[in-house]
A protein has these predicted regions:
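Right-hand nucleic-acid polymerase module
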Residues: 1-145, 156-312
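Cys/His-coordinated zinc-finger cores
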Residues: 149-153
Length: 312
């Protein structure tokens, strides 16, 4: 199957459309032919059933970091949607970063250390009459093999003051921490998921050849160094994706976080629901089979309900 950009952008009004609501961001996916779900169903982590033939097959698990890159991209798309659903009012949120002083590479320890911190933080909230927030946490691999963790704390009201040096850092106790307000960004999920996938050029060049992306784009962005200082570095877009080990739980969240909502309609009806919102992206794709025949056309659009207000 090959994916090609369509010549001209013209989704038919009667095309089937999936509308995904993610806080202030709405995604429209219109398609010429409706997909009624995958032709397979998962049995367990190693086996699946082909619904067309009834046969049971084994999954071909990715054995290398390269095999895992596409899976990580899909997970980061989930992260993007989850953040956009919940981080909608910047003053109600805080973005925390947790690191290790040593080159800590143990995934299980990372999970255990986070759970211990979370229990301590909940007790601190009780003692200080602070409402317990919801959280979304995402792990980030470093080129040297160590792990960082980024966590969004989300309150239903203005976030309380959290002193990084006297509250968060001592409570964590494994390395430097950073606690900051969420910047007035109208698509925090897109910014953050790109932040997780990108990598400083100097770290990227130190990777083994099989860990490097085959093609990449270099930009300049502000990043936090090992001492917690913000510096400007050359960044390799998508350079960090291959550092995530296969099967790792990249994202974790509290039970109360909101999830994206989905509805189905014609493209024409979906357009009415985003009327007045600012379109931030659109692209059309042609899905072509190995025999050269077009299988389907898919059109994607993103709308932002806040950006219009910001521009007025």
């Amino acid at each position: 199957m090959n994916v090609l950009l369509v010549d001209g952008y013209a989704p038919h009004p009667k095309f089937f459309c999936k509308t995904t609501h993610m806080g202030n961001v709405t995604e429209l996916t219109a398609m010429q032919k409706r997909s009624y779900g995958a032709p397979t169903v998962r049995i367990d982590k190693d086996h699946y059933k082909d619904l067309r033939s009834g046969c049971i097959h084994e999954y071909a698990h990715g054995e290398t970091r390269a095999d895992n890159a596409d899976s990580v991209r899909r997970t980061l798309a989930t992260v993007r949607a989850l953040i956009n659903c919940n981080v909608t009012v910047p003053q109600n949120c805080r973005w925390l970063t947790f690191t290790y002083a040593e080159n800590m590479t143990d995934e299980k320890r990372l999970s255990a250390d986070w759970k211990k911190f979370w229990q301590k933080f909940k007790r601190w909230c009780v003692r200080n009459y602070v409402d317990e927030p919801e959280f979304i946490g995402v792990v980030e691999p470093q080129g040297r093999g160590a792990w960082h963790m980024h966590v969004f704390f989300i309150w239903s009201h203005t976030a309380p003051y959290l002193d990084n040096n006297t509250v968060i850092a001592p409570m964590w106790g494994h390395g430097f921490t950073k606690t900051k307000s969420v910047t007035n960004c109208d698509n925090v999920g897109a910014y953050f998921s790109a932040y997780l996938g990108d990598m400083p050029l100097d770290e990227f060049q130190d990777l083994a050849p099989d860990e490097q992306a085959t093609t990449f784009v270099i930009n300049e962005k502000p990043v936090t160094d090992q001492d917690g200082q913000t510096v400007t570095k050359k960044i390799v877009k998508g350079g960090r994706l291959k550092l995530y080990p296969p099967g790792m739980n990249i994202v974790r969240s509290s039970k109360g976080v909101k999830r994206p909502t989905v509805e189905f309609s014609s493209y024409e009806e979906a357009q009415k629901k985003v009327c007045g919102q600012t379109q931030t992206f659109k692209a059309g794709y042609s899905l072509v089979g190995d025999d050269g025949n077009e299988v389907n056309q898919v059109y994607k659009e993103y709308y932002n309900a806040v950006r219009k207000d910001m521009q007025e």
